[in-house]
Amino acid sequence: MLEKILKKTIHNQLDSFSGWDEQKVKKFQQDLLSWYYDQRRRLPWREKPSLYGTVVSEFMLQQTRVSTVLPYFERWMKEFPDFRVLAGADESDVLKLWEGLGYYSRARNLHKLAKQIVELESIPQTRAEWLEFPGVGPYASAAISSIAFEEPEAVVDGNVVRIFARLFKDQREYKGTAEATKKMATLTQSFLNIDYPGDHNQAVMELGATVCLPKKPLCLICPVSECCLARLSEPEAFPKIKRRAKRQVIVSRAFSLSNSKLLLYRHPEDAPRLAGLYELPKLESLVILGRPRLLFSRDRAISNDKIKEKIYNTDIAENDLPAGHFWVNVCHIDEVPMSGPHRAWVIELISKLD
């Protein structure tokens, strides 16, 4: 049965069907798992597995490197050790602990998810059920349901697409990663080890993160290299995904300090990305007294934008502030939630004044 499914799946999707049958797929699965059990990174959410730890790690790992996540995960688990404690926390405390990880909607959605979980009579176990929670998409729902409950659902993200595109030397061009993951879903599901779906998914993710890298893949130590068609030519050429040109953006911001108080802007609660977070205000929103003086410029990237942030020393009309702008005593700066870059800029500038 599996052989028929594979032939239909691979023939329909790729031209490079090369004798894959049930035996070859089983060898792929076994080689992958053997490598994973022997070489996997010892990560806290793997060493002490729990549903809550799995959910937290999946939220944190969205668009963020493992090395960055590790200290945040450890602090989070100490402060909010389970769904109930997290559900009872103030959002400001949740955002403060998340500070520096970016993409703060993840923290708010995780907080909302915890509140919903504690109200349920039983914990959901299927991918379909987890898809109903805020912030849980196709990838996270498959990861959570397979790792925590052994549901046979394959994960598909950019790492997984890269592995299978190279495995079959996929010549198709995709408009973006989203299209590639959608078209690879049936194929990756056909390769899933249904006896150990959670470990299989983690093994594939581990392979993409540590061996089958976007640049300079480590083909010589890859556990499944012997069945990879791209390994002998140009593996870096796969997958073929069109890259959008990054948009150049310039943002001018005010650093205004008066009577030991710093002017900050607080995003409203209905803001799409940074709700409730404080930041240095934009010059365009303020009434400036005199001529601003450039303090420094910083380059950063958010999604598809390349942003040049220019920070100016400015004098502000203190009694005529627009909505959402507040004077915050520098002694209390640590207490307000800010994004990582803004926190770093504020600390740097205040330290220069001492």
What feature does the model see in each segment?
Residues 1-41, 47, 206-354:
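Intrinsically disordered, low-complexity, charged terminal extensions of DNA damage-control enzymes
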Residues 16-20, 31, 35-220, 224-234:
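Catalytic cores of DNA base-excision repair glycosylases
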